[in-house]
């Protein structure tokens, strides 16, 4: 869920993809070139269908396209990930897509993000912190990039490490957040694709409980190696 937000403009999320299983939209993802989508490892399911160029779930765009995964790549062959590490998955589409009015890739970041940046996150996730209410069109919200400790301190039960390849983002006073169904979607800071929605509190958007995002910049070498055909590439330790 994107909470405390507004409906996205139909033209501002050409890179956003929707992951379906059967008829259920369960995660988002980001098109990074004509053949590859980046999302969260915990979004891995059997029989994924990928919709590109989608805005309304009820009224299709003329240029919507559907794909299925040709290959999936994880940091570890075991597909393991934790709350603080390796929640990232690369999906190779079964055939390339063409740019269109509502489809275009989002570039990988050229520099790391800075704490204090205003970031935008996008998704079709729940729009109520307590009710199973899902929107027809994706919602967008601006949140702040925070110190990692801001995500570590509120969750002592998770025993998160002192350092992490995870970004922390949210609004400390609460009210704005990603939520159930937004996993795998992008966090865009100062125009750059910096994070993949990973996990947060439930109920969402609670004060002093921001959410965590996989840090894309730290995984650039792995992403670029996999795309180049070096399928034995390893993620950063």
UniProtKB/Swiss-Prot annotation:
Name of the top EC class for this enzyme: hydrolase
Intrachain disulfide bonds: 27-43, 119-189, 151-168, 179-204
Propeptide: 1
GO cellular component: extracellular region; extracellular space; extraorganismal space
Single Gene Ontology MF annotation: serine-type endopeptidase activity
InterPro entries: Peptidase_S1_PA, Peptidase_S1_PA_chymotrypsin, Peptidase_S1A, Serine_Proteases_S1, Trypsin_dom, TRYPSIN_HIS, TRYPSIN_SER
Entry EC no(s): 3.4.21.-
Active site: residue positions: 42 (charge relay system), 87 (charge relay system), 183 (charge relay system)
Positions annotated with a glycan in the UniProt record: 80
Gene Ontology biological-process entries: proteolysis
SUPFAM superfamilies found in the cross-reference section: Trypsin-like serine proteases (SSF50494)
Residue ranges of domain Peptidase S1 in the record: 2-228
Description of activity control: The hydrolysis of TAMe (tosyl-arginine methyl ester) substrate is activated by Ca(2+), Fe(3+), Mg(2+) and Zn(2+), and inhibited by EDTA, PMSF and DTT.
Origin superkingdom: Eukaryota
One Pfam family cited in the UniProt record for this chain: Trypsin
TM region(s), chain numbering: none
Keywords: Disulfide bond, Fibrinogenolytic toxin, Fibrinolytic toxin, Glycoprotein, Hemostasis impairing toxin, Hydrolase, Platelet aggregation activating toxin, Protease, Secreted, Serine protease, Toxin
Record Gene3D superfamilies: Trypsin-like serine proteases
Record carries keyword Disulfide bond: yes
Main location: secreted
Family statement: Belongs to the peptidase S1 family. Snake venom subfamily.
Protein name, UniProt field: Thrombin-like enzyme agkihpin-1
Source organism of the structure: Gloydius halys
């Amino acid at each position: 869920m994107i909470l405390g937000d507004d409906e996205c403009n139909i033209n501002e999320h050409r890179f956003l993809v929707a992951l379906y299983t059967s008829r259920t939209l369960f995660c988002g993802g980001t098109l990074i070139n004509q053949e590859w989508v980046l999302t969260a490892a915990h979004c891995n399911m059997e029989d994924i269908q990928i919709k590109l160029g989608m805005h309304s779930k009820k009224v299709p765009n003329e240029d919507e396209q559907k794909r299925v995964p040709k290959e999936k790549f994880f940091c570890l062959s075991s597909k393991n990930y934790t709350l603080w590490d390796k929640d990232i998955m690369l999906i190779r589409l079964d055939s390339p897509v063409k740019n269109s009015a509502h489809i275009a890739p989002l570039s990988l970041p050229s520099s790391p993000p800075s704490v204090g940046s205003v970031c935008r996150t996008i998704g079709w996730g729940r729009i109520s912190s307590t009710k199973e209410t899902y929107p027809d069109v994706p919602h967008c919200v601006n949140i702040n990039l925070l110190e990692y400790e801001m995500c570590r301190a509120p969750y002592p039960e998770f025993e998160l490490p002192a350092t992490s390849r995870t970004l922390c983002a949210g609004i400390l006073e609460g009210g704005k957040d990603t939520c159930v169904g937004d996993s795998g979607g992008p966090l865009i800071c100062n125009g750059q694709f910096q994070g993949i929605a990973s996990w947060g509190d439930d109920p969402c958007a609670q004060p002093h409980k921001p959410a965590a995002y996989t840090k894309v910049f730290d995984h650039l070498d792995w992403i670029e190696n996999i795309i180049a055909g070096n399928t034995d590439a390893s993620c950063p330790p």
